[in-house]
Amino acid sequence: MKKYISVLTIMIMIFLAACSNQNTSSAPTSNENNTQSNSITKLDEGVWPANEYTEGLPVAPGTVECAALDTEHENCNINLTGISENNYNEYMELLNQEGFSVIENVSEEIEGENYVSIGTLLSNDEKWLSISYIPNSLTIYISFDNN
């Protein structure tokens, strides 16, 4: 279980880094540590991405706030807003109907915030989904590998 929580945390961190609103200079720099990977493509906001990762997935409810495709790490991340817990539960049922099985499900009450954070790892033997839900926000990490 700890492994899945660690994997979920890493995937969310990668997604948040890919979707951050960073201003990067196009001017060359001599600092090699200051380079941005060309493998991450920011996808259109407000539109459910259509690619090999999302193919066969039901379109999630809510509004796509940010989405990114990382060709180096072979994954796609989608962050949606306007999601209720009922929307989340309905989407999980749609994924189940599409052949996805829950591998791990973790929920945690966020102290002092009066809500529950839910993390779910699913697979259909072809794709792996890591889904994180907090009120009003759903993040989906999609890969073809469980690492």
Model-found features: residue ranges?
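Positively charged n-region of N-terminal signal peptides that target proteins for export
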Residues: 1-4
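An acidic-aromatic pocket/loop used at catalytic or ligand-binding sites
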Residues: 20-147
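C-terminal motif of bacterial Sec signal peptides marking the signal peptidase cleavage site
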Residues: 14-18
